[in-house]
UniProtKB/Swiss-Prot annotation:
Every Protein kinase domain range: 4-260
Annotated source species: Oryza sativa subsp. japonica (Rice)
GO annotation terms (biological process): abscisic acid-activated signaling pathway
Protein name: Serine/threonine-protein kinase SAPK5
Originating gene: SAPK5
Listed GO MF terms: ATP binding; protein serine kinase activity; protein serine/threonine kinase activity
Length: 370
């Protein structure tokens, strides 16, 4: 931690606190996610780090390293100066179709790469998509806490993800294809960008999770008359919002859909994306970059190093005197209180969804999940 200095807090959630930090030597700004040592350091945290570490793509926030302090495990990542895509939507109300397509194209390319690396995200949403600070913002997928790798883990069957974005099969509590569930979540993201509202929520009763889940299961959504959405875009949404995941459009089919291909930036075309799918090609691209910083952008830590650090963070040290702050000797007790409140709210949200799921006789027959 000695090589970083704090700049300011940039976020908080049920995980803990996120801070903007500066590398004292290089002056590079990084985002650092602090998770309190002890019971919070669980399988999800280790999975997030290992999965994130393996991903090298322009539309995915770069993982840099993980370090342990007296009180926290700190995940060091690329800093996205443009903030959340969610905030941009809130400010605009909704996007014009061309702008929505611009961000959707980047989202799909990033998720498609994750799937090629055998990782499904399982919690795709606007809040987990960041933007860099460029005039034409580059979208960056973040937060791999719920992700699963088919190379390291079994097929998912837990009900994870955010209810407004969740796919019907995820509610089945049976094994499902996480990649197909990600496709559904991408569709919800596109809809929200176009309409400025969630497709399966009743805007007059947004906290009625029972109604939301019922609408998800019956694929009950509509595009308001006052929102102009072209027919090709409507067709794509209708192919994404299909209850049976095996009849749903695939990520590859989305990438060949006429609406997706319209005004597709050169760097997102298949021939330009190919280098990221070849690990050796990606390594060569990094090592041959003119900037030394680009060559060092990927984490030097091995999986074994990360496992050792995470295991260390699962224990809470008993210092001779209290350790304050996040490892640099400042008093940040107030910062620790805010996430606890948000965590309670998040727990209530998830708990309600589970209760609704348990109390409603959901018809899963149309899903045909084996």
């Amino acid at each position: 931690m000695e090589k970083y200095e704090p700049v300011r807090e940039i976020g908080a959630g049920n995980f803990g606190v996120a801070k903007l930090m500066r590398n004292k030597e290089t002056r590079e700004l990084v985002a650092m996610k602090f998770i309190e040592r002890g019971n919070r350091i669980d399988e999800n945290v280790f999975r997030e780090i290992v999965n994130h570490r393996s991903l090298r793509h322009p539309n995915i926030i770069r993982f840099k390293e993980v370090v342990v302090t007296g009180r926290h495990l700190a995940i060091v990542m690329e800093y996205a100066a443009g903030g959340e895509l969610f905030e941009r939507i809130c400010e605009a109300g909704r996007f014009h179709e061309d702008e929505a397509r611009y961000f959707f194209q980047q989202l799909v390319c990033g998720v498609s790469y994750c799937h090629a690396m055998q990782i499904c995200h399982r919690d795709l949403k606007l809040e987990n998509t960041l933007l860099d600070g460029s005039p034409a913002p580059r979208l960056k997928i973040c937060d791999f806490g719920y992700s699963k790798s088919s190379l390291l883990h079994s097929r998912p069957k837990s009900t994870v993800g955010t209810p407004a974005y969740i796919a019907p099969e995820v509610l089945s509590r049976r094994e499902y294809d996480g990649k197909l569930a990600d496709v559904w979540s991408c569709g919800v993201t596109l809809y929200v960008m176009l309409v400025g509202a969630y497709p399966f929520e009743d805007p007059k009763d947004p906290k009625n999770f029972r109604k939301t889940i019922s609408r998800i299961m019956s694929v009950q959504y509509k595009i308001p008359e006052y929102v102009h959405v072209s027919q090709p875009c409507r067709h794509l949404l209708s192919r994404i919002f299909v209850a049976n995941p095996y009849k749903r459009i695939s990520m590859g089919e989305i990438k060949s859909h006429p609406w997706f291909l319209k005004n597709l930036p050169r760097e997102l075309k298949e021939e330009a994306q190919a280098v990221y799918y070849n690990r050796r090609g990606a390594d060569h691209a990094a090592s041959s970059a003119s900037s030394a910083a680009a060559a060092a952008a990927f984490s030097p830590q091995s999986v074994e190093d990360i496992m050792r650090i995470v295991q260390e963070a699962q224990t809470v040290p008993k210092p001779d005197k209290p350790v304050s702050g996040y490892g640099w000797g400042t008093d940040d007790d107030d910062d620790d209180q805010q996430p606890a409140e948000e965590e309670d709210e998040e727990d209530d949200y998830d708990r309600t969804v589970r209760e609704v799921h348990a109390s409603v006789d959901l018809d899963m027959s149309n899903l045909q999940i084996s």
